Amino acid sequence: MSKPGRTILASKVAETFNTEIINNVEEYKKTHNGQGPLLVGFLANNDPAAKMYATWTQKTSESMGFRYDLRVIEDKDFLEEAIIQANGDDSVNGIMVYFPVFGNAQDQYLQQVVCKEKDVEGLNHVYYQNLYHNVRYLDKENRLKSILPCTPLAIVKILEFLKIYNNLLPEGNRLYGKKCIVINRSEIVGRPLAALLANDGATVYSVDVNNIQKFTRGESLKLNKHHVEDLGEYSEDLLKKCSLDSDVVITGVPSENYKFPTEYIKEGAVCINFACTKNFSDDVKEKASLYVPMTGKVTIAMLLRNMLRLVRNVELSKEK
């Protein structure tokens, strides 16, 4: 590239949603004695990243008119009971849990303990099923919008902000012709992100330590939802081939030692890092046209947006 690429801060993207969120909270307050919706966060670990996320969530939500209650659970064995109690508390509008807690399948179980009506993170199995099947509503009348997991949704919104989505195409096909690579296939972010992008029309290379897969909706988007094809076991050669074919490189490797090779980046590509550590080297902008080093502030904006959507869904359900 003739000149270095630009850095796009997450705060700049998040700002585009702030006015909408604040206005909706103010409307809510008019019918709820001047009080904003209540978000309850559960912290049952000593993870510094989780504590930082909790601090960011509280600061951002309260600045926008929400009420926020961080409940620290000293004995993690009592977390499930605390979540169930919040599920049944009509004063609570949204619930989130700062993971990891147990760091195993028990965490996946806890994700399902949060009732879907209050699941601001979009981790409930109903929401995941809708995501993977490209279903965008909870009801046949298309009134109750399904909830998407916060970080994958944040990355979609970043791509929209960067005009990677083509608004001239029909909704649901606006990534047609784009190729993306996602270096992470976790059940929380990587896999659902690959599915979301493919369901919107992209060809997505999904990378983990074992293999590389391709997510697409088939030739000319003939399929209603994404299809997964195994490309082979992980190798540097296959990674390089897929990456150099990609217009967008998205990384989420939770390791300070990991750096995505700059020489694998296609000239003019867009690079986005959603890990809490830097996954790209300092020379990334020698190849990338646009570089987003962190996504956290957009993730929190999507969490609050999800919460307002849940509040709206509850209100619409009562009208039936």
Curated annotation (Swiss-Prot):
Keyword Chloroplast: no
Enzyme class: oxidoreductase
Entry PTM: The N-terminus is blocked.
EC number: 1.5.1.15
Keywords for the protein's UniProt record, in alphabetical order: Cytoplasm, NAD, Nucleus, One-carbon metabolism, Oxidoreductase, Purine biosynthesis
Pfam families: THF_DHG_CYH (PF00763), THF_DHG_CYH_C (PF02882)
CC per GO annotation: cytosol; nucleus
Record's catalysed reaction(s): (6R)-5,10-methylene-5,6,7,8-tetrahydrofolate + NAD(+) = (6R)-5,10-methenyltetrahydrofolate + NADH
Note: Present with 16200 molecules/cell in log phase SD medium.
Alphabetized PANTHER family for the sequence: C-1-TETRAHYDROFOLATE SYNTHASE, CYTOPLASMIC-RELATED, METHYLENETETRAHYDROFOLATE DEHYDROGENASE [NAD(+)]
Subunit annotation: Homodimer.
Name of protein: Methylenetetrahydrofolate dehydrogenase [NAD(+)]
Organism: Saccharomyces cerevisiae (strain ATCC 204508 / S288c) (Baker's yeast)
